[in-house]
């Protein structure tokens, strides 16, 4: 009889072991929130099965990563949500390109939706800096509705932690120093017309109706506080409309933004302290600006000075051009300056040169005490 019971037990264990991770973990174990939220950005693996995603997540989960900001279609994101059920406390965020639409077949079918620079070049045809910069105009009602509908398609996903807006801005009117000097070999000592966007006819008409003149009538439109504030408002109102719809769906809204408010406003017309976000992820990529690690503290402190923790501040760090020791220091500086969490761009880069161990050290120090 004991042999029969033992055999039956082994059969049950075997059946359990071959079940997909999602089937084995239907009920999530309640877990405490991390004191310091740790996360990664990355692209989805379009061909990955749920079980292979579970295996991919394993080393990150062991290092304390609990938030995955994944870029892919709603159908692809759904597989990551299912895989996350294997790990208590893991959250999936749908990272979406918003105003920039380089590979978006729906948007690309509407050249009239794309933004225009001060020279008059349309972003559909003219590539500022790189070919994957294809900027929609937030002043075109149809483009605006499309961006909101796109966010809604992610918000409809059951189990999603947040809709994560990226490229929710205008083109970089001014690049960081290092990008100017070494990547693009240009000098931007003023707002050059070919990089200064927002001049779509719909935007010009809307501005003209409000102020009685076109920004193009001005000798130096980039110096006009009214034209600056107009563009800030166009993006901010879009975000807040998306926020209202996302929150009505019961989901949170997060966004990847430029480092601190003054820089964000001046360079990409992004006024993120006024946005109705649940999580804000400033990309504190100090190397892009030829700054040292101490600059990260400056950026975090200046961001929090305007947001006062009305939403969670998660400091974004660029992984590929930093040592493991400096990555640890950068994360620690972010947290000690007030950040509620740290995101790493990107997950794949953490698997090199001992960098995932730096994340593990941060998790041990702040979350496992």
Question: PLM features: residue spans?
Answer:
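Aromatic-lined carbohydrate-recognition surfaces of secreted/lumenal glycan-active proteins
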Residues: 164, 171, 195-217, 222-266, ...
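Boundary/entry segment of secreted carbohydrate-active catalytic domains
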Residues: 25-55, 255-259, 320
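The substrate-binding groove and active-site-proximal loops of carbohydrate-active enzymes
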Residues: 41-46, 65-71, 129-145, 223-234, ...
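Substrate-binding cleft/loops of secretory-pathway carbohydrate-active enzymes
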Residues: 173, 252-290, 322-325
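Active-site-adjacent "subsite" loops/lids of carbohydrate-active enzymes
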Residues: 93-156
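Catalytic domains of carbohydrate-active enzymes, especially glycoside hydrolases
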Residues: 50-76, 157-162, 274-280, 337-341
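Substrate-binding cleft of secreted/luminal carbohydrate-active enzymes
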Residues: 277, 282-295, 303, 309-369
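Aromatic- and acidic-residue-enriched segments that line the glycan-binding/catalytic groove
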Residues: 100-128, 168-216
């Amino acid at each position: 009889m004991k042999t029969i019971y033992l055999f039956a037990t082994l059969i049950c264990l075997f059946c359990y072991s071959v079940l997909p991770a999602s089937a084995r973990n239907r009920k999530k174990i309640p877990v405490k929130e991390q004191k310091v939220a740790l996360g990664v950005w990355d692209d989805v693996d379009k061909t990955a099965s749920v079980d292979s995603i579970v295996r991919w997540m394993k080393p990150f989960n062991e290092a304390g990563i609990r938030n995955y900001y994944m870029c892919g279609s709603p159908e692809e994101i759904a597989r990551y949500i299912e895989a996350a059920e294997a790990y208590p406390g893991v959250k999936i965020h749908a990272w979406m390109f918003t105003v920039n639409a380089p590979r978006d077949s729906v948007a690309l079918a509407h050249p009239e939706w794309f933004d225009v620079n001060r020279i008059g070049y349309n972003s559909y045809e003219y590539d500022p800096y790189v070919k994957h910069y294809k900027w929609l105009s937030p002043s075109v009602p149809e483009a605006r509705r499309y961006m909101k509908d796109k966010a809604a398609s992610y918000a409809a996903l059951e189990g999603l932690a947040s809709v994560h807006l990226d490229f929710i801005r205008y083109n970089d009117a001014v690049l960081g120093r290092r990008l100017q000097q070494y990547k693009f070999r240009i000098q931007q000592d003023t707002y050059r017309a070919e990089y200064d966007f927002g001049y779509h006819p719909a935007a010009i008409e809307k501005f003209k109706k409000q102020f009685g003149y076109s920004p193009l009538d001005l000798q130096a439109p980039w110096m006009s506080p009214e034209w600056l504030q107009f563009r800030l408002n166009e993006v901010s109102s879009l975000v807040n409309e998306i926020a209202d719809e996302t929150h009505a769906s019961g989901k949170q809204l997060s966004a990847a933004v430029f480092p601190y408010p003054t820089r964000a406003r001046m360079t990409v017309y992004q006024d993120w302290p006024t946005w109705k976000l649940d999580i804000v992820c400033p990309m504190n990529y100090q190397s892009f600006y030829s700054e040292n690690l101490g600059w990260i503290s400056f950026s975090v402190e200046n961001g929090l000075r305007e947001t006062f923790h009305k939403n969670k501040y998660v400091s974004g760090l660029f992984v590929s051009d930093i040592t493991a020791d400096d990555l640890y220091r950068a994360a620690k500086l972010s947290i000690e300056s007030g950040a509620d969490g740290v995101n790493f761009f990107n997950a794949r880069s953490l698997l090199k040169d001992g960098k995932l161990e730096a994340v593990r050290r941060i998790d041990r120090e702040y979350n496992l005490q």
